[in-house]
Regions:
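Bacterial N-terminal signal peptides
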Residues: 8-18
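Cyclophilin-like peptidyl-prolyl cis-trans isomerases
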Residues: 21-302
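Bacterial N-terminal signal peptides that target proteins for export
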Residues: 1-9
C-alpha cells in the first residue's frame, strides 16, 4: 500500500525539543527571546536514558540509524514495529520509495509498496489524549496551541486550558513531522497501515515550498536519535531503481546482548541545559518563523 503524498500547503507545526513552562513558551510566538550566555557542556543531570525496549538499531547499506519509539503517542504502532523487528520481517527490506526533501519509505515485504505483514492492519493513531499526567515538555504556546516534546517525539497539542472544559480534562495532541520523525504508511483508508513506515528527511518541504500536510493524517510513532545523515543519504526514486538501499537488520536494543548494546543518553528537554538551548535557538532565529525544529539537543551514544 502506498503512502499518499500530501503536498497541500497545510500548516505543519514542527517540534524538536522541549522546555518547561515559564521560559520562551510563556510568550506568544514572535515575541523573541533575549540571548542567554553561551552554552556550557550538559551535566549528567541534564540527560535522560531511553528504555532499551523503545530503542531500535537499524543497520542500513548507508550506515546505522538509532530510533526511539513512542508508546504514549502511538502505542499500537510502536508495538507493531517492535514486534515485526523481533520477527525479522524488516531484515533485508528495501527503501523502495524515497523522495528528496520529503521521506524514505520502507517496511514492505515485497519492496514495492504493495505488500504487508501477516498481522492485521492497524487502527489509526493520528491523535492521542494529553492530560496533566502526560509527560509533555512545553516549548512554546502559539495561537491557542502548545508545542513540545513527549519523550523524543515532537508534539503539537491543544492548550491544556481547554482541559477545564472537557469531561476527562484531556485535550487532543499529535506527533508533528519534523526531520527524523517516523510515520506509518497507509493507503487512502485510514485503517490500512500495517508494516510499512517512513522516515522524514531533513528538509521536509514540498516542491512549492509548502509543508507536506502530514500532521493528523499519518500516525507518528518515533524519532531518529542518531543517523539522520544516513536517512538523508538513502538513494532516491519513486520507485527507487535497483539496487535499492536496504535495512540490513532491525534490532530492539533490549534484545541485544549487553556487550553489544549501544548505551544512549539524550539531553532532557526540561533540564536546565535543555531549557537554555531553547532560548538560545529562539534568540538566534527569526522570532516569527521559529519552531521547535530549530533546536537541537545532544544525543550521546557509546
Amino acid at each position: 500500500m502506498k503512502l499518499r503524498l500530501a503536498y497541500a500547503a497545510a500548516l505543519v507545526l514542527a517540534a524538536a525539543v522541549s522546555i518547561a513552562p515559564g521560559l520562551s513558551g510563556a510568550k506568544p510566538k514572535g515575541a523573541g527571546a533575549p540571548a542567554p550566555p553561551p552554552a556550557t557542556p550538559p551535566t549528567d543531570a541534564d540527560f535522560r536514558t531511553p528504555d532499551p525496549k523503545d530503542l531500535l538499531v537499524i543497520e542500513t547499506t548507508k550506515g546505522k540509524v538509532l530510533v526511539e519509539l513512542n508508546d504514549i503517542a502511538a502505542p499500537m504502532a510502536a508495538e507493531r514495529v517492535r514486534t515485526l523487528a523481533r520477527q525479522g520481517v524488516y531484515n533485508g527490506r528495501g527503501f523502495f520509495r524515497v523522495i528528496d526533501n520529503f521521506m524514505d519509505q520502507t517496511g514492505d515485504p515485497l519492496d514495492t509498496g504493495m505488500g504487508q505483514s501477516s498481522l492485521p492492519n492497524l487502527q489509526p493513531e493520528f491523535t492521542f489524549k494529553r492530560g496533566s499526567d502526560t509527560p509533555f515538555a512545553l516549548v512554546f504556546k502559539s495561537n491557542g496551541a502548545e508545542e513540545g516534546y513527549v519523550g523524543s517525539l515532537p508534539v503539537v497539542s491543544q492548550s491544556m486550558d481547554l482541559g477545564l472544559l472537557t469531561v476527562d480534562h484531556r485535550v487532543d495532541a499529535w506527533g508533528t513531522y519534523c526531520a527524523g520523525v517516523l510515520g506509518i504508511a497507509r493507503a487512502d483508508d485510514p485503517a490500512s497501515g500495517n508494516s510499512q513506515f517512513f522516515l522524514m528527511r531533513t528538509n521536509a518541504t514540498s516542491p512549492d515550498g509548502g509543508s507536506h500536510g502530514l500532521d493528523k493524517q499519518y500516525t507518528a510513532f518515533g524519532r531518529v536519535l542518531a543517523g539522520q545523515d544516513v536517512i538523508d543519504a538513502i538513494k532516491t526514486g519513486e520507485p527507487v531503481a535497483q539496487p535499492q538501499d536496504k535495512m540490513l537488520s532491525v534490532k530492539v536494543v533490549a534484545d541485544m546482548p549487553e556487550a553489544s548494546r549501544p548505551h544512549v543518553r539524550v539531553v532532557d528537554a526540561s533540564s536546565p541545559w535543555g531549557r537554555a538551548a531553547i532560548i538560545r535557538a529562539e534568540a538566534a532565529s527569526n522570532p516569527v518563523d521559529f519552531t521547535v525544529c530549530d533546536v537541537k539537543l545532544p544525543v550521546e551514544v557509546k
